[in-house]
Amino acid sequence: MPLSVEQALANFSQRYVEAWKAQHDCLPINEELVGLASPCIEETRDLEISWQPIVRDEAIRLHNIEQGIELDLHDDFHAFYGTQYSADMTAKFEDMNIELLQVWSDEDLERLQGNMLGHLVMQRRLKLVPTLFVAVTDDEMEVVSICNQSGEVILERVGTKNRTVLAANMAEFLNKLEPVIAA
């Protein structure tokens, strides 16, 4: 039986934390999120926080986006953003470096929903098949997204029809990721 998106995300998150611990002998550390509340925070120091992913008590669906654009969003999208809190995590997919986007807090979730709504409105204006971004790449004009129609995970050039299929679904994509931990 194939893994669910929720399980694949939990597995990758665990691999990420374990890789960080193996390299740094502590939980992941972040300097950019200092001062931003989150259930992920384990310890706060002057210029950094240590954190770990936290599974939500109850999974959520991002209905605000669906209502705002009048479009049903793919279940993999809801599962990816609605099951845990986490800082963004760096990874490698084949030879491509990515930063897997995550929800740090409920306030961050509101920001994500606004950004996703703007992304979908732009795609509608350009008459593009709707996609739902899940990661950024080294090239600021390329993002990794879920195709809302097929559920395939794709690399897309923002605002264009240039799309390359990376995986048949989000669980498969997450299973192929390798954590990348900065020195």
Curated annotation (Swiss-Prot):
It comes from the Bacteria. It is found in: Cell inner membrane. GO terms for cellular component: cytoplasmic side of plasma membrane. Pfam families: Syd. Keywords: Cell inner membrane, Cell membrane, Membrane. The keyword S-adenosyl-L-methionine does not apply. This is Protein Syd. InterPro entries: Syd, Syd_sf. It is a peripheral membrane protein. Belongs to the Syd family. The keyword Membrane applies. CDD domains: Syd. Interacts with the SecY protein in vivo. May bind preferentially to an uncomplexed state of SecY, thus functioning either as a chelating agent for excess SecY in the cell or as a regulatory factor that negatively controls the translocase function.
